[in-house]
């Protein structure tokens, strides 16, 4: 016994068997083809002999035809048996492959069952619930912070938009006048201007002050 000889695997055995069966099948098919050609020749000869009226020769040829057709039938049966053996061998190999696969799957399931024992599963579920709760709290805190920031930004944006809208309505000139207007009550007494200047601008100043007071009052209502 050669200890260094490579062990034959089921796949190698199947390949060898299929090759041998294919060779045998081709040999039988060649023989069947040859006999079928001989059958055609013999049939033609029987017809020719029958036309001459030679009854004895015709019967001898007919017996040869019967034996020939029987040989063809036997060879066809052998070919069918070889094909059946090939199919059976392939089925056995498939069963072997399935068995090997089932063994591997069984080992995998055993390993998973060991890793996922009830106590380990309970611990995994508990850890998952804990981490999930922490994640929910973190997300909630982040959402509150984001909402608060957005609310402040929206309030500031709304205030700024409203202010700009009011300033657009009253005009940039009025805004400039408001920024340069005297602080406190507008009617407060100040140092007396020169007599000539007071006499000239008295009417115009009075009308401007009245207009500013009206617009300031409207801004306060807004």
UniProtKB/Swiss-Prot annotation:
Residues 187-203 have a biased composition (Low complexity). Residues 179-222 are annotated as: Disordered. Keywords: Coiled coil, Endosome, Protein transport, Transport. It is found in: Endosome. Its main location: other. GO terms for biological process: protein transport; vacuolar transport. GO terms for cellular component: ESCRT III complex. It comes from the Eukaryota. Component of the endosomal sorting required for transport complex III (ESCRT-III), composed at least of VPS2, VPS20, VPS24 and VPS32. Interacts with CHMP1A, CHMP1B and VPS60-1. Belongs to the SNF7 family. Component of the ESCRT-III complex, which is required for multivesicular bodies (MVBs) formation and sorting of endosomal cargo proteins into MVBs. The ESCRT-III complex is probably involved in the concentration of MVB cargo. This is Vacuolar protein sorting-associated protein 2 homolog 2. It comes from Arabidopsis thaliana (Mouse-ear cress).
């Amino acid at each position: 016994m050669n200890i260094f000889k490579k062990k034959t695997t089921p796949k190698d055995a199947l390949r060898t068997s299929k090759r041998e069966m294919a060779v045998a099948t081709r040999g039988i098919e060649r023989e069947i083809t040859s006999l079928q050609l001989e059958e055609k020749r013999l049939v033609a000869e029987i017809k020719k002999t029958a036309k001459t009226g030679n009854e004895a020769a015709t019967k001898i040829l007919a017996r040869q035809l019967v034996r020939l057709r029987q040989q063809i039938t036997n060879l066809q049966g052998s070919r069918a048996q070889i094909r059946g053996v090939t199919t059976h061998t392939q089925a056995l190999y498939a069963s072997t492959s399935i068995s090997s696969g089932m063994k591997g799957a069984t080992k995998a399931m055993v390993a998973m069952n060991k890793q996922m024992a009830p106590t380990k599963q309970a611990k995994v579920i508990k850890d998952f619930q804990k981490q999930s709760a922490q994640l929910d709290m973190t997300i909630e805190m982040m959402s509150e912070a984001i909402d608060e920031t957005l609310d402040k930004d929206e309030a500031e944006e709304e205030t700024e938009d409203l202010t700009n809208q009011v300033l657009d309505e009253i005009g940039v000139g009025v805004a400039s006048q408001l920024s340069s207007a005297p602080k406190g009550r507008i009617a407060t007494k100040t140092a007396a201007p020169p007599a000539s200047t007071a006499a000239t601008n008295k009417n115009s100043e009075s009308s401007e002050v009245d207009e500013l007071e009206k617009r300031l009052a409207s801004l306060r209502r807004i």
